[in-house]
């Protein structure tokens, strides 16, 4: 793949165009860290990018036992598929995905078995710092269940407790700056992500009109103004 070798981190990686196909070996990310290595400060601004891990590493992010941090995609067509127990974009097996921003382009993120589409690998978290904005068109799905629970579309990887498999918790991304043309499509864990999604998220819009008074609290995308 592209990034760190065995026990090596992969950081400060920028792709601006062209056609890039990156496949990591066992424990290595497609783009990012090698075995036990974090994948951080990874930026894609354009091009056609396909990133897959052989096993245990994220498509884009951490290798096996490596976190995926500060990953930004602002354009292009990006397909990221995690290896077994890893996220599509984010953490490798048993590691987290943090500070992930999708602000443009067409992005498809699929978790490997029990991994999140975007977020954490097996038994690991995807932080709340996932932002989808602009004209981004994002497709996500978690990995199918195994002995552990299925991964979230965006959020945590699956885990197993004393009672059996536990599915990964979904984390709500920040869509405050998502344009009307942008969207997030969630597909069933383990699916091929074609046809009708199980859920589509867009940023609702509306108009507020007033002709008098004083604004005392400005509206935000998460709350009304008065």
Model segments located where?
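Helix-turn-helix-like N-terminal two-helix hairpins of bacterial/phage DNA-binding regulators
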Residues: 28-30, 57-59, 87-88, 117
């Amino acid at each position: 793949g592209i990034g760190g070798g065995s026990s090596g981190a992969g950081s400060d990686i920028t792709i601006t165009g062209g056609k890039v196909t990156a496949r990591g070996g066992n424990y290595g990310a497609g783009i990012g860290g090698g075995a036990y290595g974090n994948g951080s400060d990874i930026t894609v601004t354009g091009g056609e990018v396909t990133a897959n891990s052989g096993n245990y590493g994220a498509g884009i992010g951490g290798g096996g036992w490596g976190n995926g941090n500060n990953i930004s995609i602002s354009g292009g067509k990006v397909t990221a598929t995690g290896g077994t127990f890893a996220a599509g974009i984010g953490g490798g097996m048993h590691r987290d995905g943090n500070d992930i921003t999708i602000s443009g382009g067409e992005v498809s993120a699929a978790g490997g078995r029990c991994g999140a589409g975007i977020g954490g690998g097996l038994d690991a978290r995807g932080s709340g710092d996932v932002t989808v904005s602009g004209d981004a068109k994002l497709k996500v799905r978690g990995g199918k269940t195994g002995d552990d629970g299925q991964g979230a579309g965006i959020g945590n990887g699956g885990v197993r407790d004393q009672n059996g498999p536990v599915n990964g918790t979904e984390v709500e991304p920040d869509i405050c700056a998502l344009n009307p043309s942008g969207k997030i499509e969630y597909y069933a864990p383990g699916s091929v992500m074609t046809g009708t999604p199980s859920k589509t998220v867009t940023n609702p819009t509306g108009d507020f009109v007033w002709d008098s008074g004083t604004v005392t609290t400005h509206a935000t995308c998460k709350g009304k103004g008065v």
